[in-house]
Amino acid sequence: MRPNRFSLRRSPTAVAAVALAAVLAAGAPAAQAAGAAAPTAAAAAAPDIPLANVKAHLTQLSTIAANNGGNRAHGRPGYKASVDYVKAKLDAAGYTTTLQQFTSGGATGYNLIADWPGGDPNKVLMAGAHLDSVSSGAGINDNGSGSAAVLETALAVSRAGYQPDKHLRFAWWGAEELGLIGSKYYVNNLPSADRSKLAGYLNFDMIGSPNPGYFVYDDDPVIEKTFKDYFAGLNVPTEIETEGDGRSDHAPFKNVGVPVGGLFTGAGYTKSAAQAQKWGGTAGQAFDRCYHSSCDSLSNINDTALDRNSDAAAHAIWTLSSGTGEPPTGEGVFSNTTDVAIPDAGAAVTSSVAVTGRTGNAPAALQVGVDIKHTYRGDLVVDLLAPDGTAYRLKNSSSGDSADNVIATYTVNASSEVANGSWKLRVQDIARQDTGYIDSWKLTF
């Protein structure tokens, strides 16, 4: 997040260095009013975003900074190396990527734009984060955290073969720390007709603060509710974000009437006693004592906050893009949406899906989508049972995993199994005190 508005700012001279046609024609969105109606299409459940994957991206960004003068700031080699890393991941995942160049302070900057094929080009949902750091450090929380979460969510879209109703576009902004230069350049150079196609922009800036709060932007009621509902499902209270008002990359979008929202875990403001009581952490201490400092390193991340916010980002993107989650013609989805209660420390329960109309055996990459609501997911053992009773372990219990819910997609090599028949999801709670239920699950052939 850039410093507050009273800090010294340079006046940018943004100059295009690449043709904008590829960026502007890559499917910009149809503007909805800030109070747009909630999506009516049945949204597919978002997958769990693996914390280990997000942290692996942070490790790469840390290494890039270490190899390039200790930072990833605008105009420095570390920033371009960061862009190259993210772009390579997206290119390999099937995205159409575009580098948008601009000039600020006599140095070349870059925005990275990534479009996922498909979706309505007149309704574009964007999600983004600034990729640059300040010059004093690696910027792992500010804003490696947001950049890594958005990247891993984009990769999850690819892994799931997700087909949203809206067109999805992801962005990593340059020179945010100099005054939102990259995002302003993008918005200012987007024709009004293309701006009108933007259904919304989601911003993720500093989402792993070491003494975290859980703050939600209140700029658009639909987006705000989407995030609040997600955290309510985790029994995590939220507050409206005020510290970063106008200080991150959602501001240029908001200024031209695009619905915006986002998440934040706090920067230099001090955590109050009331906030420490509901969120944990240390009262009287900044949410991020290393904000804009050299100590904003890998050790400056709260894993729980990063994990929750990464999953919340995916949830919002899946929900607001209103996708059905159904695969291309020729594939098949078989699901069960009937709730099944899971007894506390009791016998295993099952939920059945009848697969019909298939020929031959199941695929070697059978996708098993699971949505289990539970207050301590480490208690759960989850198996897929083939029609002949063969069990495929999807998830083991883990006493140290205290997070809520199992929302994930697993891949099973079921090529030895006949496709048609009754498949079952089996779930057992092996420890006491926590409860839950199977919300829904599906097989994708």
Curated annotation (Swiss-Prot):
Sold by several companies as an extracellular extract called Pronase. Its cofactor is Ca(2+); Zn(2+); Mn(2+); Co(2+). CDD domains: M28_SGAP_like. Calcium activates the enzyme, inhibited by 1,10-phenanthroline, EDTA and EGTA. End-product inhibited by L-amino acids. Non-competitively inhibited by NaF and NaH(2)PO(4). GO terms for cellular component: extracellular region. Belongs to the peptidase M28 family. M28A subfamily. This is Aminopeptidase S. It comes from Streptomyces griseus subsp. griseus (strain JCM 4626 / CBS 651.72 / NBRC 13350 / KCC S-0626 / ISP 5235).
